[in-house]
Amino acid sequence: MSRTTIHPRAIDAIADLLTDGMTICVGGFGLCGIPERLIDAMAEHGARDLTIVSNNAGIDNVGLGKLLRSRQIRKIVASYVGENKEFERQYLSGELEVEFCPQGTLAERCRAGGAGIPGFYTKTGVGTLVADGKELKEFDGQTYILERGIRADLAIIKGWKADASGNMIFRKTARNFNQTMAAAGQVCVAEVEEIAAVGSLDKDNIHLPGVYVDRLVQGDHYDKPIEFRTIRERSAA
């Protein structure tokens, strides 16, 4: 029997899980595949002093930008944050703690945490500020940094379709960090655009098994914004 529970609204799926000071892994890459409705629910709930683990920090008033605007985030662990002016303001003023992490290292830290691996060594960041305060070890004449796996209190992710048992399908590049973040959370809450009957999805196309999904909600009103819309000149088409 599936342990995945289906909830009518995002706030119903997440409200009793949120507490001040918790660590939350958030899926998505830029604005692609972000759990928009669950982020809205977090803003509505008002939990504060959060540590957010995410590849990006959203943009102003979109995605995690909403939680930055409402001052709910105390610390962000991310690899790229350059498109959010409110993030910039809070970081430069000392209001926001930031841990910069190379993108591949961030993905592996979350994957390791989800797999029960406490840490791993990597050459990425040796000789840079990324290595500051971390254990260094030499293997075969090469220096490596010890990076710790990330295990969060909660993971929130976004998928395209799921069946009622939580087996999920992502749409193209919207898969991004969502799979990895799901396993890194003690509890995973997923939002999808469509919930289908158990057995109706092609088993060979399941990207995330339902064993990783504790709670499921069907979202609505997705704007699917494009961070940078670039088109060719008509003459070049």
Functional labels for PLM-detected ranges:
Residues 1-237:
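Conserved alpha/beta enzyme-core scaffold
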